[in-house]
Amino acid sequence: KRQFVRMAMIFQACRNSSAAFLKIQSDAGNGVQENAFLHNKYINYLITELKPVTGEIIRQGAADGLIVCQQPDALAEIVLLVLVVKLDNTLIPSTKEETEQTISELISLLEKGTDNPEGSLNFLKL
């Protein structure tokens, strides 16, 4: 189950870094174009840096028989895209409830798609 602890840490890192980046960006007073450029670089960096780590966690979980996954890196990218976009909340602005619903459905999809029992990935909830 250490894979789930590591995944929870990545989720927390996404949440914390998104909040910190948005605060810094709002305080910086940059122009719209510069903010968009920096935001794009930030999202790219976050996904690029976390994808190998997340993929390795998924591979380890599959090797340990905890999950079923044929393409760990693809699954890692899907998870990170949803988490980063929803937690960032600027590309597709959403209410807290909408974000919670999306994350809940991602959890349900992941549990079913990786043969994990219902509720086993609830640590991802906001």
Where is each model-derived feature located?
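Short, hydrophobic secondary-structure boundary micro-motifs
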Residues: 22-27, 70, 119-123
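C-terminal peripheral helix-coil segments that are non-catalytic and often amphipathic
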Residues: 52, 56-63, 89-126
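Short secondary-structure transition hinges
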Residues: 16-66
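Short alpha-helix boundary/capping elements
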Residues: 12-16, 83-87, 114
